[in-house]
Amino acid sequence: MLVDSFNRVIDYIRVSVTKQCNFRCQYCMPTTPLDFFDDEELLPLDNVLEFLKIAIDEGVKKIRITGGEPLLRKGLDEFIAKLHAYNKEVALVLSTNGFSLKKMAKGLKDAGLSRVNVSLDSLKSDRVLKISQKDALKNTLEGIEESLKVGLKLKLNTVVMKGVNDDEILELLEYAKNRSIQIRYIEFMENTHAKSLVKGLKEKEILDLIAQKYKIMGMEKPKQGSSKIYTLENGYQFGIIAPHSDDFCQSCNRIRLASDGKICPCLYYQDAIDAKEAIINKDTKMMKRLLKQSIINKPEKNMWNDKNGGTPTRAFYYTGG
């Protein structure tokens, strides 16, 4: 079992398999050239697999595959299948923009993926183009429908931005509710790569908009997890991830392995342990030592409200968001 200095059990690891992405979203990397990562030096997935086997043996119960856009990484199906074969009890989930999901959904399901989280920030093609700099809505919606067809579980993630998509909160909720998919609204998380371009809505503002149409009956906050779950009068549940309004540091159970081999104990924490050499060499003892050291290094709280260091300079697409 992995336990940090504040007696939190760490049983969830987010793994970025690439920094590359075919979107340039306003809230992530809006000004990064599309060919910026063409020379990215990727960690071999078989080596990453060995690191994750160690993490599983030490008590990790959930692995999320992220990026960048993870569906751009070649050999992903096989990687997931090997992870699933190693321990079928571990939940394997993936976050994606959905652009390539239609052609990959069945392969991901067959490989053993438990669930896919799809970013859906608008149901209007022109807005998706404005937000992501990609004419992508048709592909993303088709990917969602194909996932439902093949039986792959889904959640939707929406970053709510003032004057951009905040007038679609109810429409997006209806879209998700009609398909029995949970949607999670996310407060915009500032980073130096998108800080000045976007203003987000806070949790209360999102709830006020939903309450204009629906009666919200109650809220529950899972012991572990980043989202609060709200229940409507008709029984439908949606989530809000509100790190600004109410951080979840006290119950945080996760660390991150970035695509460059750094183990990051917190998304909003600059210090990371470089495990690249150990992973490349498949040095089991060193990988285990560095994993445990990263758990010890995990801070009690993020630095969100620290005026001297609250906005991270490490982009989220490096650490997997």
Curated annotation (Swiss-Prot):
InterPro entries: Aldolase_TIM, Elp3/MiaA/NifB-like_rSAM, MoaA, MoaA_NifB_PqqE_Fe-S-bd_CS, MoaA_twitch, MoCo_biosynth_MoaA/MoaC, rSAM. It catalyses: GTP + AH2 + S-adenosyl-L-methionine = (8S)-3',8-cyclo-7,8-dihydroguanosine 5'-triphosphate + 5'-deoxyadenosine + L-methionine + A + H(+). Its EC number is 4.1.99.22. Pathway: Cofactor biosynthesis; molybdopterin biosynthesis. PROSITE patterns: MOAA_NIFB_PQQE (PS01305), RADICAL_SAM (PS51918). GO terms for biological process: Mo-molybdopterin cofactor biosynthetic process. The keyword Aminoacyl-tRNA synthetase does not apply. [4Fe-4S] cluster 1 binds at residues 21, 25, 28. [4Fe-4S] cluster 2 binds at residues 249, 252, 266. Binds 2 [4Fe-4S] clusters. Binds 1 [4Fe-4S] cluster coordinated with 3 cysteines and an exchangeable S-adenosyl-L-methionine and 1 [4Fe-4S] cluster coordinated with 3 cysteines and the GTP-derived substrate. Keywords: 4Fe-4S, GTP-binding, Iron, Iron-sulfur, Lyase, Metal-binding, Molybdenum cofactor biosynthesis, Nucleotide-binding, S-adenosyl-L-methionine. GO terms for molecular function: 4 iron, 4 sulfur cluster binding; cyclic pyranopterin monophosphate synthase activity; GTP 3',8'-cyclase activity; GTP binding; metal ion binding; S-adenosyl-L-methionine binding. Its cofactor is [4Fe-4S] cluster. It comes from the Bacteria. Residues 5-233 form the Radical SAM core domain. GTP binds at residues 14, 64, 95, 155, 254-256. It holds the Pfam family Fer4_12. Monomer and homodimer. Catalyzes the cyclization of GTP to (8S)-3',8-cyclo-7,8-dihydroguanosine 5'-triphosphate. HAMAP family: MoaA_B (MF_01225_B). Belongs to the radical SAM superfamily. MoaA family. This is GTP 3',8-cyclase. The lineage of its organism: Bacteria, Pseudomonadati, Campylobacterota, Epsilonproteobacteria, Campylobacterales. The gene is moaA.
